[in-house]
Amino acid sequence: MTKTIGLLVMAYGTPYKESDIEPYYTDIRRGKKPTEEELQDLKDRYEFIGGLSPLAGTTDRQAEALLEALNKEQDDVNFKLYIGLKHISPYIEEAVEQMHNDGIKEAVTVVLAPHYSSFSVGSYDQRAQEKADEYGIQLTHIKHYYQQPKFIKYWTEKINETLEQIPNQEHDETVLVVSAHSLPKGLIERNNDPYPHELHETAEILKQESNIIHVAEGWQSEGNTGTPWLGPDVQDLTRDLYKEHQFKHFIYTPVGFVCEHLEVLYDNDYECKVVCDDIGVNYYRPEMPNTHPLFIGAIVDEIQSHI
């Protein structure tokens, strides 16, 4: 008899329409409403990338692709999909409640973020767990999947494809900037959080597996909290790398993200490119994983190792 297990795919969430922007931003700021200036700044960023972020649709497609791939691999288990978002409906708690209403007793949770931090993935897991405990649902949490061979293979292929656009004799004048979303430094240090190490390990593996010669690690998209965040910021890093090594070609791989959204389309494709244009170097940013079979396969492999 086939057993039904819940598959709770969790993600950050993004506004679906312009009127969602203020409540969404307020939720991110833990109930503190943004000023008119802050709200307009966010609206301007969305406008710059062509309206609202494509994240919502991509999250749905990634979750559906993951469900399909998992169910193809299983004969005795049937996964049922639930999507839970951090900052907009359907919230994580709503997804767990729906599981309960559907009679789900057991579920696997996965966050659409490849590296673990107690501040990010850990907070998603905690919210899901607290709600699941109310209903007696047993959850298996997938912590990370950056180390999965298919995840590494995806990025290795993209790096090598990008290098092919650069003359061979200029590969030594090319640098790969590997980045993830910055987080508050104090919080990371207090918790002895593995997040910076996991990004470093990713960068090291990509250097070993790809044809790139020079690799640098950076952080991006930090919040405006008035406290130190993990650095160096990718824009500062770009200027420093150029100043120290005179690299001609900069390849940006924001491996902490899994699709094209505001942080990639604006913070990389606009802000980093502005810096590259300013110092007179070439900007490259390979396509993000989105629903690529290697990326989906990496998550499938990680889930299968836990069930």
Swiss-Prot record:
Fe-coproporphyrin III binds at Y12, R29, R45, Y46, S53, Y124. It comes from the Bacteria. InterPro entries: Ferrochelatase, Ferrochelatase_AS, Ferrochelatase_C, Ferrochelatase_N. Keywords: Cytoplasm, Heme biosynthesis, Iron, Lyase, Metal-binding, Porphyrin biosynthesis. Its main location: cytoplasm. It catalyses: Fe-coproporphyrin III + 2 H(+) = coproporphyrin III + Fe(2+). Pathway: Porphyrin-containing compound metabolism; protoheme biosynthesis. One of its GO terms (cellular component) is cytoplasm. Fe(2+) binds at H181, E263. Belongs to the ferrochelatase family. This is Coproporphyrin III ferrochelatase. It comes from Staphylococcus epidermidis (strain ATCC 12228 / FDA PCI 1200).
